[in-house]
Design a protein with these regions (language model features):
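Beta-rich strand-turn-strand
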Residues: 124-128, 138
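Active-site/ligand-binding surface loops and adjacent short beta/alpha elements
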Residues: 141-143, 151-226
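Short, hydrophobic/aromatic beta-strand segments
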Residues: 30-32, 140-146
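Beta-strand-rich N-terminal accessory domains
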Residues: 1-57, 202-223, 267-278
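Asparagine-centered strand-capping/turn motif at beta-strand->loop junctions
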Residues: 21, 132-138, 277
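Beta-strand/loop-rich accessory regions of lumenal/periplasmic or secreted enzymes
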Residues: 51-76, 163-169
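Extended, loop-rich substrate-binding clefts of extracytoplasmic carbohydrate-active enzymes
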Residues: 71-125
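Active-site pocket scaffolds in enzymes
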Residues: 40-42, 214-277
Length: 278
């Protein structure tokens, strides 16, 4: 079914603090804190209910990267999700909503398993918590990748520092998947960057996001972190990304990438990121 303008769910915590989820991919397309947008969405992003949305927080599942059986980064970001629970205030005033994706004939053509994937979004005063629960409802085990492909909005990517990567091994996709070790305490991005860092620290702090503030990302059960910026080198290969936009975004993507998880029947796996405006 094609997504339409009405295919969005808005969490509103008051004080112009909102989070908007597009049911196409359950993609978080906006997170505003006191009216200030924290996420980057390309001006050329396509909202046709077909293509994945270029920006915000798309969900990569069940496969990361190019995939022999389906589209790059899997089908979750191009599937129509259901609202499991409409936004409701919790006792402390935070707002929670739940979304779900269940196997169907289209997903089974690519990945012949039964599953239920639930996304829980909690909007706090200065925090956004995004969790997934994956249930294996098949009769056999399956393996999966999962990643929150978070596009942060930044005034100038060259001024951002990212902590939590020092000493980690990484796959450099810009260098024929060569494997290197990160020596830097603070990683900067000054050129085309596409790296899968393995077993990163639980927290990343990204400096110089909107208004020169810092953003903390805390992750649970999501061991790896992808850092991506297409720069002018690969911007022009994407029809839904402006050639002048790369300075204004940085993708810091927490996920299960290098070693897929094996999930047994009737078992569940939960992972979370918390984004915190500092
Ligand atoms: O264009 P897509 O499919 O949204 O992917 C964007 C990028 O996503 C990143 O996670 C990958 O590491 C990159 O290789 C990829 O280019």
């Amino acid at each position: 079914m094609a997504a339409s303008v009405s295919s969005v769910v808005v969490l509103d915590r008051g004080n112009n603090t909102t989070c908007t989820i597009n049911l196409h991919g359950a993609t978080i397309v906006s997170w505003r804190v006191n009216n200030q947008e924290q996420l980057f969405v390309s001006k050329l992003a396509v909202f046709d209910g077909q293509k994945s949305i270029r920006g915000g927080i798309p969900i990569v599942f069940p496969h990361f990267g190019q995939w022999a059986y389906g589209p790059q980064h899997g089908f979750a970001r191009t599937s129509r999700w259901s609202v499991e629970k409409q936004p409701e205030p919790l006792d402390n005033g935070d707002i929670e909503a739940l979304f779900s994706l269940v196997d169907n004939p289209i997903t089974k053509q690519m990945w012949n398993y039964s599953f239920k994937l639930v996304l829980r979004v909690i909007l706090r005063e200065k925090e956004l918590q995004v969790s997934f629960n994956l249930y294996n409802t098949s009769v056999e085990p399956f393996q999966f990748n999962m990643l929150f492909h978070t596009y942060l909005k930044v005034p100038d990517v060259r001024k951002c520092n990212i902590s939590g990567l020092q000493g980690c091994m990484y796959v450099d996709k810009t260098k024929e998947n060569g494997i290197y070790q990160e020596p830097r305490e603070m990683v900067t991005v000054n050129h085309w960057t596409d790296r899968i860092y393995q077993n990163t620290q639980q927290e990343h702090v990204i400096s110089n996001v909107v208004s020169g503030r810092k953003m903390k990302m805390i992750k649970y059960n999501m061991p790896d972190t992808v850092i991506w910026n297409p720069w002018d080198v690969t911007s022009n290969t994407m029809s839904d990304f402006g050639e002048d936009e790369y300075p204004n975004m940085i993708c810091v993507e927490a996920g299960i990438v290098i070693t897929p998880i094996t999930l047994n029947p009737n078992n569940t796996y939960e992972g979370t990121i918390v984004l915190q405006v500092m």
